């Protein structure tokens, strides 16, 4: 079966060119739909947050729309907001390895004091002293999907012990109900959960208080999963450390106290932003749309 697919820009046309199931129509997310859009059954949406509201408002103009396909794993901009009867599929699997890699990089940088040594280098200061190591560290990962599995495979060769947490307990995965009792027994906590009403401020003051002194909080999920004010208080007190690829607010204002808090390493939301990112996202999107065109549910169906 051939389906009409709206793709954002010529990059989308090039990525899906040659797919026999696709009749491609290019659109500009910042402008009105092109004339052939009325027959579109699939809409591929860009990851840029600033276009989401406009596209959602214009979706009723697509009477045949049946599937919205994202190019990111996060779907908080779209979930629960689509017209009735429209499916939502994401790009889970496209960015898991690179996002996990950044989380591992952050932990290594904190334990080996890379920011301090860089500051010493800038000041031409030779300060030889011992550091911590990832070997033997107990890492609690809130998440059990492809990101979490990838992180575990990256950390365990360093000698770390990794515990995954999912919505329900199963082989090799603990339940979210156990998180309060698990926090105190781990040296690092990595947030890899989707952002929704249930995970908003998941890492609040009470959550952070249960973490041991000098534990490291790593957030590669979404900024609002962490209560920023509560985290700044813990960092300022010198009790916890943090690695953040995402912040709340984001982008982080230049005068925000988080920038100058001790013990924090901040990345500007670049976990998945690596060489080949776009190609990987479109490859996953093609798999999802191809399944839909064949009359099947997309493997990454969200809702």
Range-by-range predicted roles:
Residues 1-50:
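N-terminal glycine-/charge-rich "phosphate-binding" loop or analogous flexible N-terminal tail
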Residues 89-102, 116-117, 250-303:
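C-terminal helix-to-coil terminal segments
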Residues 157-172:
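NAD(P)-binding Rossmann-fold cofactor-contacting core
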